[in-house]
């Protein structure tokens, strides 16, 4: 892919300002994690969830195959999630995704390229050393919704107060 998305620091600053103003009756916890392209799967985010919790993932960044040629992979196809060291692994079809946690534990993030998943738990057979050749990375915003909150409605309300590259509204639309 080619192009110039929002910078990772700008994304973190803008989304952080929006989420910092949210009441705890909507969002139980939010955090940001830097997932560098050179990091093999799986990175523990420290966000603890219970089975059944709803989590929204919001992504910004680029993973470069060739930075000089500006050839990069969009985070929507690069970043995968799982909970507690077990599958199912999943990702969204865009730079946002909301999922219901199948397990209790911490949310983990995995870079896909250059790996190929061999099972639903996210094991790889690729040499983890190959990740050292990748550059760039993804800033990942994680939102753990309070029990009983409708993420689509909450995301619409957040987007009305301020959005980052229309990511919050796009996820609300996807959920509806």
Question: Which functions belong to the PLM regions below?
Answer:
Residues 3-176:
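Gly-Asp-aromatic-enriched flexible segments
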